[in-house]
C-alpha cells in the first residue's frame, strides 16, 4: 500500500478512490479531475503494478498500460524504504519513456531526514530520468509542490471535461466501490478479493436516494461469512457504506 489512492483523494479534495490497508485495493482506473480558473489536471489512479496471476489482475494491468499511452506526465510513487521492482518490463518503460516522470517518495514522515536523503540518492540512480519529490500524502506534505510541477510540465490545450466535473465515473460506480471498501475493511484472506458488487436499482427521490445492491461471491460458504451471525455482518457493511455515501 504505497499511498496512490490517498494522494489522488488529497489532490482532488474528494474521496474518489477507496482506501484500505490491503494490497490491490484499486481494481479500476479512476480519473480524478482538478479544476481551477486557468487549468484542468486529469489524474488517473491505476491499480498497483504487479505480475498478474489471474484474469482480473491481467485486466487491472491493462488499465496501467492504457494510462502509459494517455499520460502527459507519469507519476511513479514508491514508499520510503521500498527497493523491489514489481515489474521489470514496466519499469524499463518508465526509465525509457519520452514523457516527464515524477517519482514521489511517500511516507517520509515515518523516517529521519538522513534516511530520506539516502532514499532520494537511491532512486536517482535507479530512475535517472525522474525528478524525485519527497512527500507525505497522509499529512499533505509537498502536495502543492506536486501540482505546481505538473502544471509546468503539462501542454497547453483545451479542457477535456466540464469545469464542474471531478471524475469520469458514474455515481453507481462509487456506490459499488464504497460497499467493496467495507468488505475489504472487515473481512480477511480471500473473501475481499472474491466479491463483486452490482448496483441493481438506484432511485433518486426528492429527499432520499434508494439503492439496491447485490454482493456476488465465488462460493456458497463465503455467503454465510459475509452475512454473519444473525445478519450482523451484512448489516455492518450496509450501515457504514450508507454513512459514507451520505457524506459523499
What name fits each language-model region?
Residues 1-69, 73, 214-216:
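Conserved G1/Walker A P-loop phosphate-binding module
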Residues 3, 142, 233:
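Conserved glycine(s) of the Walker
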Residues 10, 14, 33-37, 49-52, ...:
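Conserved, well-folded catalytic cores of nucleic-acid-processing
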Residues 26, 49-51, 83-84, 111-112, ...:
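Catalytic P-loop NTPase motifs of RecA-like helicase/translocase cores
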Residues 30, 64, 106, 146, ...:
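Residue-level signal for inorganic ion chemistry
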Residues 35-40, 59-132, 203-208:
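Conserved C-terminal guanine-recognition region of P-loop GTPase G domains, centered on the G4
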Residues 99-102, 109-171:
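Canonical P-loop GTPase G-domain recognition
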Residues 171-248:
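P-loop NTP-binding site
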